[in-house]
């Protein structure tokens, strides 16, 4: 318990959210989440490695209940800017009209996918152009149901597709392409890169 308190003090300065909770970022698969870990570390965050079978969703919830003002968030559950909720917001370099055009391109790239939610976000130009995240709450619920042997086929695998409207590949290259076919192919290419990043 002393080690957890020491770690909490170590990360409190950079990993305290707007609700005054210390957010402990973690991964259970370092190889699968390499780019997410790097993105979090680039923001000055520290990521715990929970690669032992005993550290499961139940154990994490037990820790959250036991520790005061602490929450655990898996590093791939949201974009780096939202892992630790702060009141900071960037503005998009794209107009609302341009954002809508980009959104339509990515909706076509996703096709009829009812398991995903498309979001346009003004993020750092250094973040990925497109990111796929799995909400912490949904993922935990699925893991708990799987451990209890419950059928989750009706739930599906829900995820967010986040388009970084400030990334040069979106804000400059994609917007300035003249050919609609090239725009569609490029949007699809960026989406597929994000899927590869999530091992989908």
Regions found by a protein language model. Name each.
Residues 1-200:
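Long, intrinsically disordered, charge-dense linkers/tails
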